[in-house]
Amino acid sequence: MTKQHAFTREDLLRCSRGELFGPGNAQLPAPNMLMIDRIVHISDVGGKYGKGELVAELDINPDLWFFACHFEGDPVMPGCLGLDAMWQLVGFYLGWQGNPGRGRALGSGEVKFFGQVLPTAKKVTYNIHIKRTINRSLVLAIADGTVSVDGREIYSAEGLRVGLFTSTDSF
């Protein structure tokens, strides 16, 4: 069977309901925490390390929920939401590969913020480069990622780690 290499907003919503990879497997968060509108490219080859890559997008409009509260009179998308989107994509990648379990962000190395997403922006683009996947008692992916707004890179993260757990009882 051929793997799908792009996903629409409806596909991502199906993933948030646990319908894309099957019950008990990788899920994206539901809106409002779903920080992705579409995955325009996903592959298990290519990228900076030759081990897989994802490119995803979020459409920006001034009515997005976080602009009203972060910050009043100085609206900006919280940087942690961009970081979370990168973790969301690494977890999605593991599910897309057919690995079982529920995703959990496990940390990252260095994270840098050198720009911002304002309500006047049009589009955020996420680029994820898979460095390594480990499939033992825990399925784990390690990746680097960047966030760009309207074509300008504004965040970077190294060593993003996401694991899939068949049981989270002891987590």
From Swiss-Prot:
Locations listed in the record: Cytoplasm
CDD domains reported for this sequence: FabA
Active-site positions on this chain: 70
InterPro entries: FabA (IPR010083), FabA_FabZ (IPR013114), HotDog_dom_sf (IPR029069)
MF annotations from Gene Ontology: (3R)-hydroxyacyl-[acyl-carrier-protein] dehydratase activity; trans-2-decenoyl-acyl-carrier-protein isomerase activity
Pathway: Lipid metabolism; fatty acid biosynthesis
Keyword terms, alphabetized: Cytoplasm, Fatty acid biosynthesis, Fatty acid metabolism, Isomerase, Lipid biosynthesis, Lipid metabolism, Lyase
E.C. no: 4.2.1.59, 5.3.3.14
Pfam families: FabA
Reactions catalysed: a (3R)-hydroxyacyl-[ACP] = a (2E)-enoyl-[ACP] + H2O; (3R)-hydroxydecanoyl-[ACP] = (2E)-decenoyl-[ACP] + H2O; (2E)-decenoyl-[ACP] = (3Z)-decenoyl-[ACP]
Coiled-coil regions listed in the entry: none
Claim: Lipid metabolism is one of the keywords in the record: yes
Ranges annotated as spanning the membrane: none
GO annotation terms (biological process): unsaturated fatty acid biosynthetic process
Cited function: Necessary for the introduction of cis unsaturation into fatty acids. Catalyzes the dehydration of (3R)-3-hydroxydecanoyl-ACP to E-(2)-decenoyl-ACP and then its isomerization to Z-(3)-decenoyl-ACP. Can catalyze the dehydratase reaction for beta-hydroxyacyl-ACPs with saturated chain lengths up to 16:0, being most active on intermediate chain length.
Protein name according to UniProt: 3-hydroxydecanoyl-[acyl-carrier-protein] dehydratase
Gene symbol of the encoding locus: fabA
